[in-house]
């Protein structure tokens, strides 16, 4: 009988495959306002978070609340930022989509009012506010998808800092290893056809080939569920 394949071991949830979330610094969300329309804070530090590729700005607000937020391009320690409906339109400030002029790049956009921000949070990306009225705000995401959102959903003005990160090569396998380890991903990943028959359904043989159809049912047992899972079509003519 063969050994458990890597997909089965990952499903068990051991420390090798589990994300080290105890090292993550914060779950980013917009500051909630209860008694005031707008509040002011000062950037007191810029930090790195292993959970994400973008730098974080530590903000100290007037009410002595400290929190980490995504740092847009152009902000620095000592800058003043505002959160609220009457905030100035400048990078780092957070306000509802209804109060932001059309065409302004925004980041950390809420999907539903009060959820803290879900869209455009990776380094170097931004969404664009296309238009808004009393009932709906239309936002184009970095992928090109257009979303219709509640105009009271909040967003931060600017482009997320850290752009150009993907243009720098890893150079060494060790750098890639540490990057993947910070996110709880096993690296390097060995191809199934390069394994022995005991280790993978595609392993073994005198040459590297699957030796069986790669398409597999969605209901296949865990030890067989490898390859093209529940594929609608395969091959070079898949766009037809």
Curated annotation (Swiss-Prot):
Family label: Belongs to the universal ribosomal protein uL2 family.
UniProt superkingdom: Archaea
Name this protein carries in UniProt: Large ribosomal subunit protein uL2
Chain intervals with Basic residues compositional bias: 1-12
Species this chain originates from: Halorubrum lacusprofundi (strain ATCC 49239 / DSM 5036 / JCM 8891 / ACAM 34)
One Pfam family named in its UniProt record: Ribosomal_L2_C
InterPro entries: NA-bd_OB-fold, Rib_uL2_dom2, Ribosomal_uL2, Ribosomal_uL2_arc_euk, Ribosomal_uL2_C, Ribosomal_uL2_CS, Ribosomal_uL2_dom3, Ribosomal_uL2_RNA-bd_dom
Region (Disordered) location: 1-21, 198-240
PANTHER family xrefs: LARGE RIBOSOMAL SUBUNIT PROTEIN UL2, RIBOSOMAL PROTEIN L2
Disulfide bonds: none
Subunit structure: Part of the 50S ribosomal subunit. Forms a bridge to the 30S subunit in the 70S ribosome.
């Amino acid at each position: 009988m063969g050994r458990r394949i890597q997909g089965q071991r990952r499903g068990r949830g051991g420390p090798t495959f589990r994300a080290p979330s105890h090292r993550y610094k914060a779950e980013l969300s917009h500051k909630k306002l209860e008694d005031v329309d707008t509040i002011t804070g000062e950037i007191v530090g810029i930090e790195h978070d292993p959970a994400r590729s973008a730098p974080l700005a530590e903000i100290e607000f007037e009410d002595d609340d400290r929190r980490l937020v995504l740092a847009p391009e152009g902000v620095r320690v000592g800058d003043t930022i505002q959160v609220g409906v009457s905030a100035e339109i400048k990078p780092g400030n957070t306000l509802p989509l209804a109060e932001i002029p059309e065409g302004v790049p925004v980041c950390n956009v809420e999907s539903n009012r009060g959820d803290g921000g879900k869209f455009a949070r990776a380094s170097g990306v931004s969404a664009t506010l296309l238009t808004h009225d009393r009932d709906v705000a239309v936002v184009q995401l970095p992928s090109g998808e257009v979303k219709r959102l509640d105009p009271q959903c909040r967003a931060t003005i600017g482009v997320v800092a850290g752009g150009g990160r993907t243009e720098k090569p890893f150079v060494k396998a060790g750098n890639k290893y540490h990057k993947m380890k910070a996110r709880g991903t096993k690296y390097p990943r060995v191809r199934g056809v390069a394994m022995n028959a005991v280790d993978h359904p595609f392993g073994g043989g005198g040459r590297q080939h699957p030796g069986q159809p790669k398409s597999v049912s969605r209901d296949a047992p865990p030890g067989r569920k490898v390859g093209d899972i529940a594929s609608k079509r395969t091959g070079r003519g898949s766009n037809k």
